[in-house]
Amino acid sequence: MKKNRIYFGLLILALVVTIVWTSAGMLGVNKEEKKYSVSVIVNDSNNDRWIAMREGLEQAAKDDDIQLNYVSTGVFASEDEEKALIEREVENGADGIIVQLVSSEDTYAVFEKIDSSVAVMLLETDAVSEGVYSVTAPDNLWIGEALAQTVLQDYGDSLSEKKIGILSGNQNQLSMQQRLGSVKKLLEDENIEPVWILSGQGENLSSELVTKQADEPVDILITLGNAETETAVDSISSFAI
C-alpha cells in the first residue's frame, strides 16, 4: 500500500505554547509568586506522536518558570490506571494537570477526589466539562469530514469500485467517535460502506490489521489519528496492495 493511499487525521495541537500558561492562569489571578508545578499525563507518553507537543510544553514551561512533569506512561490498560496516576501527581504537589483521558465517559468520576484548587486541562478529549475544566482539542467533526472529502475528491466516480477500511482508534474517546461518525456519514451519503472498521490501539491493532487485510483486503485505508497512521505505515510491508 503506497503512503498516498493512507489518509490520516493529523492532530494539530494549536497554540500548544499557551497550554502551560493557561494552566497557570487557572490557578488564580492574584496568586503568590511561586514556581507552579504542572503534570502532563497522556496515553503512551513516549510515542512519537507526542514529540511536538512535549517540546512546545517544555519551552512554554521554561518561558513561564513552571516546573513541568511529563509523566512516563505506557498504553493504559484501564481508566482506573490513569486515575491512579492523576491522583498520585496531585498528592506529589501538582498545581495543575494536563491530561488526555482514556475514555470520555463519566469524566467527573476521574476527578472527584481531586481538590478544586488543582487546575485541570483536558487534552484531545472532547469530554463535556460542564464549565469545570478547560478543554483543548481539534474540531473532530471537521477532521472526519475533511478525511472523507479528500478520499472522495481523489477517487471521484471510481471510488465505488474501491474497498475501504478504517482504523478508528480508541472508540471510548468522544473525539475519535466524532471523527468516525463524520467519515461514515459522508461515505454513506455517497452510498459507500467500509468493508471493515477496526478500533483499538497498539500491538493488538497492528496484528488485527495484518490479519484483516489478509482476509478481507482493502484498496484504501483511512486512519483517524496519528497513532493509527503509524500502525498502518508500520504494517505496509505485510500488505499486498
Question: Where in the sequence are the language-model features?
Answer:
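Short, solvent-exposed amphipathic alpha-helices that sit
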Residues: 49-66, 143-150, 174-192, 231, ...
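Short beta-strand segments enriched in small/hydrophobic residues
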Residues: 26-53, 70, 133-134, 162-172
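Structural motif
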Residues: 69-91, 195-215
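Hydrophobic membrane-insertion alpha-helices, especially the h-region
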Residues: 8-23
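Hydrophobic alpha-helical
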Residues: 98-116, 200-241
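Flexible loop/hinge segments that line or gate small-molecule binding clefts
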Residues: 106-142
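Structured, soluble extracytoplasmic/luminal domains of envelope-associated proteins
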Residues: 77-120
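Hydrophobic alpha-helical segments within soluble ligand-binding/sensing domains
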Residues: 136-161
